[in-house]
Amino acid sequence: MRQKNKREAEDVTFELGSENVFADLGLENADGLLANADLTHAINTEIRARGMTQVEAAERTGLTQSDISRLGKMKTDRFSQERMQNALRRLGMDVEIRINRRADGGPGTLKVFQPK
């Protein structure tokens, strides 16, 4: 008889999360963390779309090659949102900031909308 491995033997349940994994994990500044991740993703996507090396991307964005490497690994701890926005602009991307009043009067959120 075949022995079940531990994964097969356990009942696994899933819970639907929100659109923000950082909020689901209970982290402080979850909106800011998600915005940083989205900005980093946009930088990495544009670098790949252009077929740039890390050195070429560094020259274009004004960042260092090691900065580009860190962003490629989604390590955002050394980067302000302003610095990432500037890198995107230097890559030829428009960065728009839109402010809306919440209908329910609750605290606002911070979101990054990327082109599809």
What are the language-model segments listed below?
Residues 36-52:
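Short, amphipathic alpha-helical "recognition" segments used to contact nucleic acids or chromatin
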Residues 81-98:
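DNA major-groove recognition helix of helix-turn-helix/homeodomain DNA-binding modules
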Residues 39, 64, 75, 91-95:
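A generic structural signal for short beta-strands and their flanking turns/coil linkers
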Residues 1-41, 105-116:
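N-terminal flexible/basic segments that precede or flank functional cores
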Residues 69-72, 85:
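Key DNA-contacting residues within the recognition helix of helix-turn-helix
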Residues 51-70:
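Short alpha-helical DNA-recognition segment
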Residues 75-81:
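Short, solvent-exposed alpha-helical "recognition" segments
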Residues 26, 48, 89-92:
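Signal for well-folded cores of large energy- and translation-related assemblies
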